[in-house]
């Protein structure tokens, strides 16, 4: 009957478990739901239920992700767990399940492993704001010093990727022992509560979409006789009021200023439009042919047009509907960035990488044929001949 107590008044956060295969991410997810179920804050979700992750589609890519939800005294969480390493990469690059924070799981028996590094690097590239560490399987290590060494190693890794390695909370426990325990006072279960306290207090509450600077990708343009030009789209973030000054950004380096003289939704006039709304904005003094799909309407000074950037791109496998063959420098696909569809060229690959194979994820430098409104952490799709061949996230803007 725990369901009755669920309240929606608490702040909501999206969290995920990351780390190397078999280090205990899924076991920990199950243990968290079991520990919080004792307090009436969750429904216990067993390991098998989490491990059978349903398929989801994001930007044309199939990803296996499990979502569980639970609460603490302070917050409501949606927790994501992916069964396979490739699913993590695809999820983080497509942003299918956005993370406000992550729990990095590292087995005391192994320490930092290749996928541990890769997940931390990805978390940095896609701007996961904060991380809490759970050193798992400490029941299987006799030597306390070994656990200390693993902690040092993890802190160094986090610092290397620009997370505050010295400040990050590190909790040591055993997900399996906590899962097998049968009372909330068990010391292993207490470690799970300690972990959730760290998540509650260390992972910052995300800025609400409505508090961010206004941005709306332009999908369509209409001309209304006697009134002017209306652009439509879904507001990505922020709020727009009638009378606000905005910029039209993208498709050239010239940024045009105008004023929104009307906002309408479902043919009704509004005083304001907020993040998530599909609206039409009437623009003062802008001709129908002076604005195009692929540009964005944005708060002045909040976003700029760019042509060249670095991105982490996941290249779809043949089985996922992607390419059958590798590609090299000079490859020219289409980049779908918000509503813009622009040809771009792969101008640089990492040192030692000659070609990119289907199934790889690689940091590459892209140069578009014309500038688009771009920012770090932004997602996009790579398409060729009408099919998605990759998904990417902008990791650095060059020019």
UniProtKB/Swiss-Prot annotation:
CDD domains from the UniProt entry: EF_Tu (cd01884), EFTU_II (cd03697), EFTU_III (cd03707)
Residues of the tr-type G domain: 10-207
One GO term describing the cellular component: cytosol
This enzyme's EC code(s): 3.6.5.3
Positions contributing to Mg(2+) binding: 26
Catalytic activities: GTP + H2O = GDP + phosphate + H(+)
Main location: cytoplasm
UniProt-recorded name of the protein: Elongation factor Tu
Gene name tied to this protein: tuf
């Amino acid at each position: 009957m725990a369901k009755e107590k669920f309240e929606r008044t608490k702040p909501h956060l999206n969290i995920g478990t990351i780390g190397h295969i078999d280090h205990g991410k899924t076991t920990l997810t199950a243990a968290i739901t079991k520990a919080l179920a004792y307090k009436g804050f969750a429904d216990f979700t067993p390991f098998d239920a989490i491990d059978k992750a349903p398929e989801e589609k994001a930007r044309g890519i199939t990803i296996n992700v499990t979502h569980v939800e639970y609460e603490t005294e302070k917050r409501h969480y949606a927790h994501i767990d992916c069964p396979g390493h490739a699913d993590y990469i695809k999820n983080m690059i497509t942003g299918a399940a956005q993370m406000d924070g992550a729990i990095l799981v590292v087995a005391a028996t192994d320490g930092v492993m290749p996928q541990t590094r890769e997940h931390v690097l990805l978390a940095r590239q896609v701007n996961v704001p904060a991380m809490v560490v759970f050193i798992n399987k400490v029941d299987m290590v006799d030597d306390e010093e070994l656990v200390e060494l693993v902690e040092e190693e993890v802190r160094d890794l986090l610092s290397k990727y620009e997370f505050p390695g010295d400040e990050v909370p590190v909790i040591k426990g055993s997900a399996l022992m906590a899962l097998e325990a049968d009372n909330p006072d068990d010391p292993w279960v207490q470690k799970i509560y300690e972990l959730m306290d760290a998540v509650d207090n260390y992972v910052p509450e995300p800025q609400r979409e409505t508090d961010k600077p206004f941005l709306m990708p332009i999908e369509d343009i209409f001309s209304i006789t006697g009134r002017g030009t209306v652009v439509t789209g879904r507001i990505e973030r922020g709020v727009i009021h009638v009378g606000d000054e905005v910029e039209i950004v993208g498709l050239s380096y010239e940024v045009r200023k105008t004023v929104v003289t009307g906002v309408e939704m479902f043919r009704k006039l509004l005083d304001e439009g907020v993040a998530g709304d599909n609206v039409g904005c009437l623009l003062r003094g802008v001709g129908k042919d002076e604005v195009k799909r692929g540009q964005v309407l944005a708060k002045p000074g909040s976003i700029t047009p760019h042509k060249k950037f670095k991105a982490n791109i996941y290249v779809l496998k043949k089985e996922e509907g992607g390419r059958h063959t590798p590609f090299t420098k000079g490859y020219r696909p289409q980049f779908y960035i918000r509503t813009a569809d622009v040809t771009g060229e792969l101008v640089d690959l990492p040192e030692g990488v000659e070609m990119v194979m289907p199934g790889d994820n690689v940091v590459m430098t892209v140069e578009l044929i014309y500038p688009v409104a771009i920012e770090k952490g932004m997602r996009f799709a790579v398409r060729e001949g009408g099919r998605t061949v990759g998904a990417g996230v902008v990791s650095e803007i060059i020019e």
